Amino acid sequence: MGSNTESDAEKALGSRLDYDLMMAEEYILSDVEKNFILSCERGDLPGVKKILEEYQGTDKFNINCTDPMNRSALISAIENENFDLMVILLEHNIEVGDALLHAISEEYVEAVEELLQWEETNHKEGQPYSWEAVDRSKSTFTVDITPLILAAHRNNYEILKILLDRGATLPMPHDVKCGCDECVTSQMTDSLRHSQSRINAYRALSASSLIALSSRDPVLTAFQLSWELKRLQAMESEFRAEYTEMRQMVQDFGTSLLDHARTSMELEVMLNFNHEPSHDIWCLGQRQTLERLKLAIRYKQKTFVAHPNVQQLLAAIWYDGLPGFRRKQASQQLMDVVKLGCSFPIYSLKYILAPDSEGAKFMRKPFVKFITHSCSYMFFLMLLGAASLRVVQITFELLAFPWMLTMLEDWRKHERGSLPGPIELAIITYIMALIFEELKSLYSDGLFEYIMDLWNIVDYISNMFYVTWILCRATAWVIVHRDLWFRGIDPYFPREHWHPFDPMLLSEGAFAAGMVFSYLKLVHIFSINPHLGPLQVSLGRMIIDIIKFFFIYTLVLFAFGCGLNQLLWYYAELEKNKCYHLHPDVADFDDQEKACTIWRRFSNLFETSQSLFWASFGLVDLVSFDLAGIKSFTRFWALLMFGSYSVINIIVLLNMLIAMMSNSYQIISERADTEWKFARSQLWMSYFEDGGTIPPPFNLCPNMKMLRKTLGRKRPSRTKSFMRKSMERAQTLHDKVMKLLVRRYITAEQRRRDDYGITEDDIIEVRQDISSLRFELLEIFTNNNWDVPDIEKKSQGVARTTKGKVMERRILKDFQIGFVENLKQEMSESESGRDIFSSLAKVIGRKKTQKGDKDWNAIARKNTFASDPIGSKRSSMQRHSQRSLRRKIIEQANEGLQMNQTQLIEFNPNLGDVTRATRVAYVKFMRKKMAADEVSLADDEGAPNGEGEKKPLDASGSKKSITSGGTGGGASMLAAAALRASVKNVDEKSGADGKPGTMGKPTDDKKAGDDKDKQQPPKDSKPSAGGPKPGDQKPTPGAGAPKPQAAGTISKPGESQKKDAPAPPTKPGDTKPAAPKPGESAKPEAAAKKEESSKTEASKPAATNGAAKSAAPSAPSDAKPDSKLKPGAAGAPEATKATNGASKPDEKKSGPEEPKKAAGDSKPGDDAKDKDKKPGDDKDKKPGDDKDKKPADNNDKKPADDKDKKPGDDKDKKPGDDKDKKPSDDKDKKPADDKDKKPAAAPLKPAIKVGQSSAAAGGERGKSTVTGRMISGWL
């Protein structure tokens, strides 16, 4: 087992090395290939055509050859933006490779569209796309790059729009902590590629164009993606710079949308929208909730919050209720603020007694609320200062009344365990009010939001100190009275005799600490000032640097403290004994002053660390090391350690702290305005909220508002229906505004791109056009027998630019990029070392890991959708048709109001018992079904001559057959029987006469004739002269004209699904050859498609709902069976083949239909088949089906292709049908029979429903918390 494991590891390592070191094999270009690549580089279309016509298929020429830079002719055409050359190369079946990615990288839109259509036409289901199948050693792009990702990297709006309209999807990255099998395998196989693929995916998701096109709420998407990138930035610190850059891009996009808000209404809608269901739904004209701005503050979107438009809106809300305040002078503003501050008790009482009065409403204004709360807090700080200065005692001493002096003396005797004084009682009341306010804030915001604000942490710490002070004072009172009442001990004695940890001393320490934090809270209040605010932000940043510094400083302090304490503790004990030689509790400072001073320096680890800390400020001298009984070596070693500590701490660490603080201040000063506005906005938003209007300590008093809530008098709650309608209105209004902003943003970005000056690409394009024109003129002159000497010699000097010369030199001199031959041989012959670490990793990997709380495989399966890198043209057309359908529904929203009531009752008799309003509602909800029923009823009544019945779509998307009833079906059968009899007479005459118009060859020679016809386009041939006369038969109603490829045959009933719809009759001049003749210029494929579609555009019926294509038009109903076929009718299928590239010279047709049964041998049972055949069978084919066909589809036909074939079709066929077949029957077939026969169409892809995104059509796929809502397609 061990040997097998080791061999597997060696094989895996060997394959990985082979992959990593795999290089493209050196290939020496022939002279023809060199000329071919140079002609493509110069844009020489005639030269390229000539080489392709002369040498394609020979050993001297390979159309897929590459230049030394590993560029094929197709990539060269894309880089030079030569569309005609690209089309020619595609027509000659060049390998596409990663040309689509190159076109996207070059931002060549026309090439992208053409290559997307090529991929859709030639790609087989289950096979890799062309850029995925390319050799990784030769590819320019990594494996994880898809067209949509690359287009997002280029941030090209137009290409992204094309791909998203086609339904292309983006492979979503899994969560960074995902532990599914796919992520674990990818991480173990190649961790670098795994991380880079994640970076590429997030770089695509961060593209502004992709967010604008794919997200219904771009601002929310930008916020959430920025927060996730911040998390990735912390978890994958190796790629911190990349994630930081992407995060900055996303933040800039969200902020740039604010630049395009033109009115206050747009800005209010943008900032007040709440994407989560809530009871408070904002509408225009109501009090602003600013939910989106709160979300921006929560996600730390500082540039978004500090935007001038946002700040203007916040300032307008902040100074609401004080008109003209901002235009007053500073002295007048100060007077107004003082008046408001001094009157805060009056306003508070008004609000408590009458919450709905004018004074109470005025107090709810944000600025007034801020002034009242600030003045209340200032009064609390005044009380703290009065308690610290012992104002009561000083007042008693100044007044010096006898009773006051007596009271003061008694208080000093009973200071331990005394009750709080009047100022302390007021402070305790304030503390209770402040704690109550903090609890309300914690309840409303939640624990997470409360902790995120650092000033709430400061409030929590100060309140904890105050609570400790109150508890310690209560404990001291209990202890004192316990000793006094129960133990009979006098607890009152001077302070110097108290225990070191007496509760009174502990309470004073806690009160002092709480006082410090309370005064520091003023910094937060001063952040509203434009001068003090930036300083407060800088101070906060420096505190973070100090905390980082103290982590290292504490480590150094503890290390040297342990060392010095180990050296000097014994000698410190000797000094202590000298100090306390008289009494253990009394120090002899008179005789042993030095010993009493220095013994504490190194007595224990705590004292040693304190000494080293104060040594940083120069408060410890070297005399402290002259301890009693210390030895010279010990003193020297201690001094050496103290010196080392001083160098590391004072010179290195302290200067590093100064440098860090300077750097932080420099960073803050560069963006001081943004940081300050963000901090000020946080302060403003805290006063915009409802509640907390009354400042402390009045918030402890019950008010009328609270009493009404307690007694049950609440506002009437909104119903769910009302909430849902309000949410829909808010969502609709927000969508309209966001569409406007996104459209303005994209327009501005496109204009900014177009405003660039002349670039190098423009010069290259002009040079390419001039070069192509030169060679075209030379070709024209040569074809007209002009004397053009030395064309080849002159063409070699076309590339006069530096890049052109370098490229030509490399091609002509066979320059190759690769290993030096000797070095490559040495590397291949060197012995690979044994990989011990991989074996060790396999042994460790056998251990079972702890089972986590999350099943990552289940999460990945749940959040995974089928990937479609490029989508399809069908999806793009469906999107446009859905928009048209949606617009039509909106325009006809009230159509049911004018509908005839009688017709409604006839349509549904149950409507006679309901009111008119109910009938109108029924019409609105059932309009689609009523319209479909009307169309079906019209089809059942019968169509005009030559018009087949339309087949409705079933749930699976296939067309169901509708059998026409009544006498129309009998007439069709009689006409079909007469037509078969006439055709049989024609066949017998043709077989007897042996005219050139029929097949006079035996059946065995049929195959050879077919191959010959495939290689050479057939010439226009006239039908047999012995055909039926004009008066013999009438055409079958709805059957259409006879098929041009089989004038003497009738198709089997089951063959309608296997053949293309008959092409409409065209003029003789419209016939196009299947392939260009030598020396002629081939028409590009796109032009051929355009010409083909323009011919059939007029005959297309209107599209049905959902953008489903209509069936192919049939021939006119007045076409007669004996009419001669026009040459264009026979050539139309050939032109279609040449255009779509669906046939190749070396491919053979095969299928159950070969050889076809002649119509002349039809038995009476065939009449039953024709009866079952529907008039619209030939119209079921869509015009676009021929584009999707491939040559191999005929052999790969699935049983589902015959699902419309009825069970009785095979039973009606008699056993003697094949036996009665005559040799002359096969003679009647023309060579064009097999030529015109086309393979079955590929299965259609599922259509996207109305309102459904392309990602939702394929199912949801693996995505993280944020990026799962990205590709939801709403434009």
Curated annotation (Swiss-Prot):
Residue ranges annotated as Extracellular topological domain: 388-418, 472-541, 631-637
PANTHER family the UniProt entry points to: TRANSIENT RECEPTOR POTENTIAL CHANNEL, TRANSIENT RECEPTOR POTENTIAL PROTEIN
Organism lineage: Eukaryota, Metazoa, Ecdysozoa, Arthropoda, Hexapoda
Placement of ANK repeats on the sequence: 69-98, 143-172
Function: A light-sensitive calcium channel that is required for inositide-mediated Ca(2+) entry in the retina during phospholipase C (PLC)-mediated phototransduction. Ca(2+) influx may then feed back and inhibit PLC, thereby facilitating phosphatidylinositol 4,5 bisphosphate (PIP2) recycling. Trp and trpl act together in the light response, though it is unclear whether as heteromultimers or as distinct units, and are activated by fatty acids and metabolic stress. Also required for olfactory adaptation and may be involved in olfactory system development.
A cellular-component GO term for this protein: inaD signaling complex
Processing and modification events after translation: Phosphorylated by inaC.
The protein's assembly and partners: The C-terminus interacts with a PDZ domain of inaD to form the core of the inaD signaling complex. Other members of the complex include norpA (PLC), inaC (PKC), and possibly trpl, ninaC, Fkbp59, calmodulin and rhodopsin. Forms homomultimers and heteromultimers with trpl. Interaction with trpl is mediated in part by the N-terminal region and the transmembrane domains. Also interacts, though to a lower extent, with Trpgamma.
One GO MF term attached to the UniProt entry: calmodulin binding
Protein family per UniProt: Belongs to the transient receptor (TC 1.A.4) family. STrpC subfamily.
Cytoplasmic face residues: 1-366, 440-450, 563-609, 659-1275
GO biological process, one term: calcium ion transmembrane transport
Low complexity compositional bias, start-end: 955-964, 972-982, 1033-1049, 1099-1118
Tissue: Expressed predominantly in the rhabdomeres of photoreceptor cells. Expressed in the third antennal segment and in the olfactory segment at approximately 70 hours after puparium formation during antennal development.
Disordered, as annotated region: 933-1275
SUPFAM superfamilies, per database record: Ankyrin repeat
Localization of this protein: Cell membrane; Cell projection, Rhabdomere membrane
Biased composition (Basic and acidic residues): 1002-1022, 1080-1098, 1144-1239
Protein name (Swiss-Prot/TrEMBL): Transient receptor potential protein
Membrane topology: Multi-pass membrane protein
PROSITE patterns reported in the protein's UniProt record: ANK_REP_REGION (PS50297), ANK_REPEAT (PS50088)
Bilayer-crossing regions: 367-387, 419-439, 451-471, 542-562, 610-630, 638-658
